A protein has these predicted regions:
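Bacterial Sec-dependent N-terminal signal peptides
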Residues: 1-24
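Glycoside hydrolase catalytic-domain context in secreted enzymes
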Residues: 17-366
Length: 366
């Protein structure tokens, strides 16, 4: 009897496999193929110029895809408290859309005050739904910098002064965002705890302090939450800018923690071609904008990892080893988001999101 039941089960399984339609296109377009197989297949079809093209912005909030292969561009958006209104392609002015509203979610300091991981999951899920509805691939949040000085005007964006609490609350937020096919870009990595002269300040920190206070929430987001993206910060850590800081990005993040996602620069945070290429930056955003200001529309080709990168490869200054790693990470992000196998259309602002925002705010009033 058991043997007959086993054979029947096998037969049904084989029949189900045979009934599945055979995919007749390239592996990278097959939604049912493993992500890594899709990545390697797409990478093998790309030119050096196309790979380099993916590593820099093409507009204020998007980076390039590979149109020849049907691989879409990557769209970034602020968080972490609501989806940013659309802006013009090359300017910071709003585009004037009438369908780009968002729910105003509570500040993350309020979320942390709930001490409730279910609330954090609700927050991430809700904001992730709105990001996906607006066709955004990377949500620039959550922020988990530690509150170390009351003079930091962005303390409200973070989850407080306790590394333990921040580490517990960031995980469900990240998971909630990413189950919608949107990458949570955890920021600002790392030791970015003041706004005054943030682009020149040098945070001199010993290893014990770094690992016990400033990194636990980032580590939890990566290793427990499975974060798909990390944003580098404007400041220097021990004398090197953080958007291409070898110790932070190569040794700790991608080495010790095994992070397989993308590192995105804060807007205008990339300062040097060679360091960016060799020290772990994957997508360069906002260069020549001084972080917040306007820029010429043709400046994208002058980014540190744009034409200078391509020129350096042609001259033999750089190998394609680092480039292939960057392209793999970007492709992996695309196949996890806009080209993921399970389509997700998200939800526009709705009563459920209004209720979620109010419930989280009420729970955080302590």
């Amino acid at each position: 009897m058991k043997k007959a039941l086993f054979l029947s089960t096998v037969a049904l399984s084989l029949a189900a496999c045979c009934n599945q339609p055979k995919f007749d296109g390239p592996t990278y377009l097959n939604p049912n193929a493993p992500v890594e197989d899709r990545v390697e297949d797409a990478l093998a079809r790309m030119t050096t110029r196309e790979k380099v093209g993916m590593t820099t912005a093409q507009s204020k909030f998007s980076s390039r895809g590979v149109p020849r292969l049907g691989i879409p561009e990557v769209w970034h958006t602020d968080g972490p408290h609501g989806i940013r209104p659309e802006v013009l392609w090359d300017e910071w002015d709003q585009a004037g859309w009438t369908n780009d509203s968002c729910t105003a979610f509570p500040a993350l300091i309020n979320l942390a005050a709930t001490w409730d991981k279910e609330m954090s999951l609700l927050y991430g899920t809700s904001i992730g739904e709105e990001a996906r509805y607006r066709k955004k691939d990377i949500l620039l949040g959550p922020g988990v910098n530690i509150c170390r000085t009351p003079y930091n005007g962005r303390n409200f964006e973070y989850m407080g002064e306790d590394p333990f609490l921040s580490g517990k609350m960031v995980v469900p937020y990240v998971q909630g965002v990413q189950k919608n096919g949107v990458a949570a870009c955890v920021k600002h990595f790392a030791v970015n705890n003041q706004e005054f002269q943030r682009t020149q300040s040098n945070s001199v920190v010993d290893d014990r302090t770094l690992h016990e206070i400033y990194l636990p929430a980032f580590k939890a987001a990566v290793q427990e939450g499975g974060a798909w993206a990390i944003m580098g910060s404007y400041n220097l850590y021990n004398g090197q800018y953080n958007c291409h800081n070898k110790k932070l990005l190569v040794d700790i993040l991608k080495g010790d923690w095994g992070f397989d996602g993308v590192v995105v620069s804060d807007w205008g945070g990339c300062r040097d071609s060679e360091e960016a290429i060799k020290n772990g930056l994957d997508i360069e955003m906002g260069t020549w904008t001084n972080g917040l200001r306007g820029a010429a529309s043709d400046s994208y080709r002058n980014y540190h990892m744009a034409d200078p990168y391509l020129k350096g490869i042609k001259e033999g200054k750089y190998t394609t080893k680092e480039l292939d790693d960057k392209a793999r990470r970007i492709l992996r992000t695309i196949f996890r988001t806009s080209m993921r196998p399970e389509p997700n259309y998200g939800r526009f602002v709705c009563p459920e999101h209004y209720k979620a925002a109010r419930d989280i705010a009420a729970a955080g009033v302590v």
